[in-house]
Amino acid sequence: MRMGSLISTCLSSSKASSSARINDSSTWSPPPGQHISIRTFRELRARQTSSPIWRRTETPSNGESFRSMDDLQEGDNNQPMTLTPRRLTLEVSQRLLTSLGN
């Protein structure tokens, strides 16, 4: 397998009597020196207080975590974002193509 060609997607769900849990995640390994992971978590409960959570973590090859300017601007809005599995796959594909083009 060539570096930069790994794309994996995981979808799991479990149901209890009054709640459902859905985990969507997708990761890929771009060229050496870059690692980008996108993971979404969405939990549905009977209560109206639950809200979707979207988290993006980018880790350079030296292992340090950091937040991009986009992340910081998103934090200013302080509104969670939901990605459907189709939208998540589209985002991952676009980022992979961008990283391979550089």
Swiss-Prot record:
Region of interest (Disordered), ranges: 1-35, 47-86
One Pfam assignment: Gemini_C4
Keyword Ubl conjugation in record: no
UniProt entry tagged with the keyword Ligase: no
GO terms, biological process: symbiont-mediated suppression of host innate immune response
InterPro entries, per the entry: Gemini_C4
Keywords: Host-virus interaction, Inhibition of host innate immune response by virus, Suppressor of RNA silencing, Viral immunoevasion
Biased composition (Low complexity): 1-27
Domain of life: Viruses
Record function comment: Pathogenicity determinant. May act as a suppressor of RNA-mediated gene silencing, also known as post-transcriptional gene silencing (PTGS), a mechanism of plant viral defense that limits the accumulation of viral RNAs.
Similarity comment: Belongs to the geminiviridae protein AC4/C4 family.
Protein name: Protein C4
Organism: Tomato leaf curl virus (strain Australia)
Lineage: Viruses, Monodnaviria, Shotokuvirae, Cressdnaviricota, Repensiviricetes
